[in-house]
């Protein structure tokens, strides 16, 4: 049972990576918009796409953690 809890915790750590990645991307997007305000529309589109992909990894990690806890392989 201990190893299952450790495995679930490691799978749930994907949320930390996603949070850091989204934070860095948002900071760079703000810098880019401050340099080129006319490109803000395109930058926001790319930021939303990148944020969605990064958040998907966190959701997959959460699902794996839940599956480890519930199904106990």
Curated annotation (Swiss-Prot):
Q: Does the keyword Ribonucleoprotein apply?
A: no
Query: Which residues are annotated as site, described as Reversibly protonated during proton transport?
Result: 55
Chief location of this protein? membrane
Localization: Cell membrane
Q: Which GO terms describe its molecular function?
A: lipid binding; proton-transporting ATP synthase activity, rotational mechanism
What InterPro entries does this protein map onto? ATP_synth_csu_bac/chlpt, ATP_synth_F0_csu, ATP_synth_F0_csu_DDCD_BS, ATPase_proteolipid_c-like_dom, F/V-ATP_Csub_sf
User: Per its UniProt record, what SUPFAM superfamilies does this chain match?
Assistant: F1F0 ATP synthase subunit C
Per the record, its GO cellular-component terms are:
plasma membrane; proton-transporting ATP synthase complex; proton-transporting two-sector ATPase complex, proton-transporting domain
Q: Which UniProt keywords apply?
A: ATP synthesis, Cell membrane, CF(0), Hydrogen ion transport, Ion transport, Lipid-binding, Membrane, Transmembrane, Transmembrane helix, Transport
Which residue ranges traverse the bilayer? 4-24, 51-71
Topologically, how does it sit relative to the membrane? Multi-pass membrane protein
Q: Which family does it belong to?
A: Belongs to the ATPase C chain family.
Task: Kindly state the subunit structure of this protein.
Answer: F-type ATPases have 2 components, F(1) - the catalytic core - and F(0) - the membrane proton channel. F(1) has five subunits: alpha(3), beta(3), gamma(1), delta(1), epsilon(1). F(0) has three main subunits: a(1), b(2) and c(10-14). The alpha and beta chains form an alternating ring which encloses part of the gamma chain. F(1) is attached to F(0) by a central stalk formed by the gamma and epsilon chains, while a peripheral stalk is formed by the delta and b chains.
What is this protein's function per UniProt?
F(1)F(0) ATP synthase produces ATP from ADP in the presence of a proton or sodium gradient. F-type ATPases consist of two structural domains, F(1) containing the extramembraneous catalytic core and F(0) containing the membrane proton channel, linked together by a central stalk and a peripheral stalk. During catalysis, ATP synthesis in the catalytic domain of F(1) is coupled via a rotary mechanism of the central stalk subunits to proton translocation. Key component of the F(0) channel; it plays a direct role in translocation across the membrane. A homomeric c-ring of between 10-14 subunits forms the central stalk rotor element with the F(1) delta and epsilon subunits.
NCBIfam families (UniProt xref): ATP_synt_c
This chain belongs to the protein called: ATP synthase subunit c
Provenance organism: Caldanaerobacter subterraneus subsp. tengcongensis (strain DSM 15242 / JCM 11007 / NBRC 100824 / MB4) (Thermoanaerobacter tengcongensis)
Source lineage = Bacteria, Bacillati, Bacillota, Clostridia, Thermoanaerobacterales
């Amino acid at each position: 049972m201990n190893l299952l809890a450790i495995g679930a915790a490691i799978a749930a750590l994907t949320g930390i990576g996603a949070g850091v990645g989204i934070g860095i991307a948002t900071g760079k997007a703000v810098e880019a918009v401050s340099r080129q305000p006319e490109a803000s529309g395109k930058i926001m589109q790319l930021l939303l796409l990148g944020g969605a992909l990064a958040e998907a990894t966190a959701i997959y990690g959460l699902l794996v953690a839940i599956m480890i806890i519930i199904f106990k392989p």
